[in-house]
């Protein structure tokens, strides 16, 4: 799909990200970072500073100079071809200068290609790479480029080559590496640590090679419906998830503005679920392999000296590539519901893919670690016989030290439920599985409530999206037959505009934030209300940006290309076809449609109306 925007569109503009899970940069309509916030300049996955919260090293800004480019830009167009990641742009200056640009990042090689065509602009075109200047970051010129090194959470080093078929004038001065040529039609590449690419490749040939790498991804799933805006957001969300997937896992985004590209198990689950229902199992497996690789670290975090004899596992809230905690100190470090997200994404990989061998060899260890953490360090047995979840940080807007919080309780129930199902299926620790199920029942009975409603927290001091948790994201653990839960959910939905922001100081803006709308839509689909679920996605949520991109909060212009919201949106759309990953649940809300998705029973489902 080719998605275009221009200066006349009255929506928030954010540059388009290009990358491959290692490289990440946003490209604006000038085909550079000339009109881009410095936060969205070039970054690389995993290359981190030694700062307390281990921000990514900012590699540098891509800027340009040519005769007439100081003149005001009076018109512009920009487009993204999601099939191959090509970003095209055209700018018109007040003085008549026109610049056309094509930019792409190879999906499987660390190469960014640029094609520039100038009109009415005599003299040289100069491409400038303004090197990052973070502490302990160093650049020096070498043949055809720059040698770089960073001393951060580890020592990093490499080479950036600047290649072109045009003879170049090269200069490195004041931290800026520049290449210049008089050509009006100019093609060049930035090549990062790719020793086999030592000569100039043809732009269109390399683009075609990259497009071939994209083909399997797009063939694994599709939807087609007569809703242009929904299709646009669905396609750009899938595009961004693909280029946002690192060799480790799925961050919120690969920029320091996006929580430093760290790995929230809470957020990554929403992307993982979308990957599962789309059948993108190679990508999903990277996520759970990352969590499995960190299992021993998580056991040490949970048990300290006893990590070799106890099975409880507690992963960091904002996990770094070395499995350590990357977040700043705050009450968010007291979250515990993310262990359920790790359990669920592991379970979903095994269910949707049908990979039972992984479940037996590795998955069962992850599920056990999560379940044992809740049993031993979260569930409290009260003198009156009730069981509740201990004080912790539930949703951050509730503040610290919330006991028996609804969402966290649902998370523990879900982790225990699926661990028990797995244990019984594999004939493993069946007596412990029975204890898990007894605990699930006891926790359900102790949820904060009165005769009419469940409460997000016992104090019932504010409504919250948390009350949806018994259906989504926690795998319907409260069941569909509970009328009190249904009343509670619809009571929240009637008031969601007031409470539909995860940040208390940014709530009450009139519309539900886009990713909370996805939560609602999924719940409605699972209740069999797919027309209403579609309406929530289409009419009730905050807007998307010019290219259909999702923001964490659109009205506040906070975090464009927000992977968490993208994952939830994709899953919400997929559940309009297969609610809860189940086929045979009635028709989607269109007369004309086609789709290819994966069911939670390991089947590929393809239908055409």
List each language-model region with its residue ranges:
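Structural recognition of the beta-strand scaffold that forms the well-ordered cores
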Residues: 17, 24-27, 284, 316, ...
């Amino acid at each position: 799909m080719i998605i275009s925007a221009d200066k006349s569109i009255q929506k928030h503009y954010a540059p388009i990200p290009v990358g491959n899970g290692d490289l990440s940069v946003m490209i604006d309509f000038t085909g550079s970072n000339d009109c881009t916030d410095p936060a969205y300049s070039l970054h690389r996955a995993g290359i981190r500073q030694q700062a307390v919260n281990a921000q990514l090293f900012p590699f540098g800004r891509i800027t340009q100079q040519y005769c007439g480019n100081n003149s005001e830009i009076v018109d512009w167009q920009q487009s993204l071809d999601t099939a191959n990641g090509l970003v095209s742009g055209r700018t018109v200056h007040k003085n008549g200068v026109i610049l056309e640009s094509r930019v792409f990042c190879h999906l499987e090689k660390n190469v960014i290609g640029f094609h520039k065509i100038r009109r009415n602009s005599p003299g040289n075109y100069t491409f400038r790479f303004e090197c990052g200047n973070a502490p302990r970051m160093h650049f020096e010129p070498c043949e055809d480029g720059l040698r770089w090194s960073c001393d951060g959470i580890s020592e990093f080093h490499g080479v950036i080559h600047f290649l072109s078929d045009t003879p170049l004038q090269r200069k490195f001065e004041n931290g800026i590496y520049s290449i210049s040529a008089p050509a009006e039609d100019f093609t060049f590449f930035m090549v990062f640590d790719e020793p086999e690419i030592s000569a100039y490749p043809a732009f269109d040939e390399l683009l075609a090679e990259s497009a071939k790498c994209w083909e399997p991804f797009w063939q694994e799933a599709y939807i087609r419906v007569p809703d242009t805006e929904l299709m646009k957001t669905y396609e750009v969300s899938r595009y961004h998830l693909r280029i946002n997937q690192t060799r480790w896992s799925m961050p919120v985004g690969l920029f320091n503005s996006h929580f430093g590209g760290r790995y929230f198990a809470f957020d990554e689950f929403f992307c993982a679920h979308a990957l599962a229902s789309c059948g993108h199992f190679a990508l999903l497996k990277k996520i759970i392999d990352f969590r499995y690789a960190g299992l021993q670290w998580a056991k040490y975090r949970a048990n300290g000296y006893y990590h070799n004899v106890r099975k409880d596992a507690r992963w960091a809230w904002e996990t770094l590539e070395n499995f350590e905690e990357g977040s700043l100190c705050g009450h968010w470090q007291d979250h515990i519901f993310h262990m359920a997200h790790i359990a669920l994404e592991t379970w979903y990989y095994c269910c949707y893919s049908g990979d039972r061998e992984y479940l037996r060899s590795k998955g069962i260890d992850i599920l056990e670690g999560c379940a044992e953490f809740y049993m031993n360090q979260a569930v409290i047995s009260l003198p009156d016989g009730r069981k509740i979840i201990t004080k912790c940080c539930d949703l951050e807007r509730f503040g610290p030290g919330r006991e028996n919080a609804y969402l966290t309780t649902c998370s523990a129930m879900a982790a225990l439920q699926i661990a028990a199902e797995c244990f019984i299926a594999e004939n493993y620790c069946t007596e412990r599985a029975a204890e898990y199920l007894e605990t699930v029942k006891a926790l359900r009975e102790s949820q904060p409530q009165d005769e009419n409603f469940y409460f997000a927290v016992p104090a019932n001091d504010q409504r919250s999206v948390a009350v949806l948790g018994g259906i989504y994201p926690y795998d319907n653990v409260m069941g569909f037959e509970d009328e009190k839960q249904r009343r509670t959910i619809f009571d929240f939905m009637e008031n969601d505009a007031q409470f539909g922001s995860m940040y208390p100081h940014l709530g009450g803006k009139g519309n539900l934030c886009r990713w909370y709308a996805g939560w609602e839509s999924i719940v409605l689909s699972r209740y069999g209300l797919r027309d209403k679920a579609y309406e929530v996605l289409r009419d009730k949520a905050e807007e998307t940006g010019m290219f259909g991109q999702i923001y964490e909060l659109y009205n506040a212009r906070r975090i464009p290309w927000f992977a968490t919201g993208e994952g939830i949106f994709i899953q919400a759309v997929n559940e309009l076809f297969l609610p809860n990953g189940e086929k045979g649940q009635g028709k989607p809300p269109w007369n004309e449609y086609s789709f290819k998705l994966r069911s939670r029973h390991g089947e590929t489902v393809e239908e055409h109306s």
